[in-house]
């Protein structure tokens, strides 16, 4: 009886699904008397509706909004700005009051970006759930003010790992597991599943999922994903699938002729794989000629109204505004059959214009190990930008390779050594970001020592905190051989030690990762005021080593206070130096949670101290004003000035 009931439920659900998808019932009941079915149609439809709803069929609501997908691909060369383009699409749709989520597809075989060198693929961006992802997820989070998960970054490694696990579990029922259909199905299922995860703190799924396909069309690594997307457009329906292709229109020769052939070939490769672009976003150094636009429309089979010209801009906050000027939002919404709504971009426009208009400079020396590639510290750069705008200052970053500050560098290349120290000495503030390994550590300690002794505002992040502690232990506490066991396992004064829960054999995903709580130990510290007098804050971590708890008492007696600790009270999270304008370091990475409208408090502290405005910002009255105004405070310094609480800095 139970088997018969189960079969009946499956039959009713399949019949109803066919009806909902507007397929003829005859496609299911072939050979049946059509006259009988037509005469009983109304009664039968009502019967199926009631049964399906009672059985909990998800399709019983015809009003359910289907997920919309915008896919962003790229051609000709890498590094065209697909991530910024995808993020800008998200900004436009969010400004139209649609809920947006993002997915990034990376065709590399690595499971995630956690074991990659910054020189190889830029920074590793850490998410709240501990996912180590591509830096583009940072762009998505910053632009759209959302919080993604590790599953929002799809890699070839993750897909094949999942498929192989299913095969080992016998989930494929003895079939030969192949790229098509098993890998492509896994990709489609992954996209569809993750697209429905809410990322904006609200309940229910988002309205639109923006999927960026990493790499370049034509790369062999991308082929399974392109095939999966080709199938996916039919799975979700053409009215729910929009493809934006980003391509390069180079200028060749002294006459400045704009060439369309590379884009034509890119579109040809895309179409041969079964995908046709809805919109073409052309990157160029200057505005495209009208004749060039017409030629692209003709040869690429794209409507002239759907060709965007994304020129080089002074800051990336202009990109969504440029796309809106060219009515890109209307083209996307129209194709997806979504209702156009007024855009709320006033704050975004204000921010883009303010970055270009502020003129009072503030220079920050960033002493790093991977300064040869700007993307290695992308989130640090963005966090500095967010804070400089809020502080009404024109940011100037002085990049310093840590090794160039070391004495050994002076012997090898004295010019580099002198140049590095000249940069450090003219900086208004010093920032030492995270890193791994022993290379450049002594140079970072030189920067920390210089900032400490000369009362220069200093912010240390992760390794930047550890080198500050080691330097203090050496030069203030008198332990000349103090070091980290990462660099010197035999040191008699280990100021920094390996965390007991870490793994020394498996590198991927074995660090202390993701959002962790930091609890303030005292209210007599600048960090507590910067965070708005909160008792605890949640910030993202990525580290294997920590400050040695056995040395904390001695360090604090000498003036280095650990004002923030983890929930157990045994792991040091924030330290501050007494009797210093601003010497703060944290074990976590505050740059990962900085947003254009909500700068990281730690970065705000550095910029404010470097520009002589910290006292005004952290006074009791100013902190209470900031707490009361909350997100309404677009420009904190101007608001503090308007309230008559400003006491420092000059314009």
Region spans (language model):
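Cysteine-nucleophile active-site neighborhood
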Residues: 87-91, 423-526, 596, 602-614, ...
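Short, hydrophobic alpha-helical segments
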Residues: 195, 300, 332-340, 476-480, ...
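C-terminal and late-domain segments of enzyme folds
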Residues: 522-651
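Flexible phosphate-sensing "switch/lid" loops adjacent to ATP/NTP-binding sites
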Residues: 46, 51-429, 435-437, 444-450, ...
């Amino acid at each position: 009886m139970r088997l018969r009931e189960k079969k009946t439920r499956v039959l009713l659900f399949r019949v109803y699904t066919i009806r909902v998808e507007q397929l003829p019932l005859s496609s299911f009941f072939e050979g049946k008397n059509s006259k009988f079915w037509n005469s009983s149609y109304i009664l039968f439809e009502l019967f199926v509706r009631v049964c399906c709803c009672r059985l909990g069929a998800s399709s019983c609501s015809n009003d359910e909004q289907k997920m919309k997908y915008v896919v962003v691909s790229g051609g000709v060369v890498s590094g065209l700005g697909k991530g910024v383009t995808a993020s800008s699409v998200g900004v436009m749709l969010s400004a139209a009051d649609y809920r947006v989520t993002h997915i990034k597809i990376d065709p590399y075989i690595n499971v995630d970006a956690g074991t990659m060198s910054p020189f190889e693929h830029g920074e590793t961006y850490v998410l709240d759930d501990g996912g180590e992802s591509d830096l583009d997820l940072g762009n998505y989070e910053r632009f759209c003010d959302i919080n993604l998960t590790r599953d929002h970054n799809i890699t070839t490694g993750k897909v094949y790992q999942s498929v192989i696990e299913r095969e080992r579990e016998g989930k494929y029922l003895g079939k030969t597991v192949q790229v098509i259909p098993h890998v492509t199905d896994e990709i489609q299922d992954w996209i569809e599943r993750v697209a429905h995860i809410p990322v904006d703190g609200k309940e229910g799924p988002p309205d639109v999922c923006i999927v960026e396909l990493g790499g370049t069309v034509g790369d062999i690594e991308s082929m399974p994903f392109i095939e999966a997307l080709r199938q996916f457009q039919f799975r979700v329906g053409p009215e729910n699938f929009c493809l934006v292709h980003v391509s390069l229109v180079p200028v060749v020769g002294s006459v400045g002729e704009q060439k369309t052939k590379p884009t034509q070939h890119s579109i040809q490769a895309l179409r041969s794989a079964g995908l046709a672009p809805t919109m073409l976003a052309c990157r160029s150094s200057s505005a495209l000629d009208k004749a060039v636009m017409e030629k692209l429309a003709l040869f690429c089979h794209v409507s002239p109204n759907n060709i965007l010209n994304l020129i080089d801009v002074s800051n990336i906050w202009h990109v969504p505004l440029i796309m809106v000027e060219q009515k890109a939002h209307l083209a996307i919404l129209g194709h997806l059959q979504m209702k156009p709504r007024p855009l709320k971009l006033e704050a975004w426009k204000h921010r883009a214009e303010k970055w270009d208009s502020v003129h009072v400079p503030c220079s920050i020396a960033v002493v790093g190990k991977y300064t040869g590639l700007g993307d290695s510290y992308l989130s640090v750069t963005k966090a500095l930008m967010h804070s400089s705008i809020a502080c009404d200052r024109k940011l100037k970053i002085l990049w310093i390779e840590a090794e160039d500050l070391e004495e050994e560098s002076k012997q090898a290349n004295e010019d580099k050594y002198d140049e590095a120290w000249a940069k450090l000495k003219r900086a208004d503030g010093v920032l030492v970001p995270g890193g791994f390994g022993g290379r450049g550590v002594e140079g970072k300690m030189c920067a920390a020592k210089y900032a400490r002794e000369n009362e220069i505002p200093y912010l240390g992040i992760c390794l930047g905190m550890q080198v500050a502690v080691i330097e203090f232990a050496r030069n203030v506490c008198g332990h000349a051989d103090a070091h980290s066991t990462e660099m010197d396992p035999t040191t008699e004064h280990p100021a920094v030690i390996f965390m007991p829960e870490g793994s020394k054999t498996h590198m991927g995903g074995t660090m202390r990762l993701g959002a962790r709580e930091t609890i303030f130990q005292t209210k007599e510290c600048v960090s507590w005021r910067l965070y708005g007098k909160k008792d605890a804050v949640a910030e993202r971590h990525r580290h294997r080593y920590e400050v040695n708890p056995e040395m904390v008492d001695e360090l604090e007696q000498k003036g280095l206070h650990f004002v923030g600790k983890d929930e157990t009270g045994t792991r040091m999270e924030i330290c501050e130096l007494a009797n210093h304008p601003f010497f703060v370091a944290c074990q976590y990475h505050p740059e990962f949670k900085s947003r254009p409208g909500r700068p990281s408090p730690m970065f705000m502290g550095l910029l404010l101290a470097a520009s002589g405005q910290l006292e005004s910002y952290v006074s009791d009255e100013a902190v209470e004003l900031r707490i009361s105004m909350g997100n309404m405070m677009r420009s904190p310094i101007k608001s503090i000035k308007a309230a008559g609480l400003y006491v420092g800095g000059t314009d």
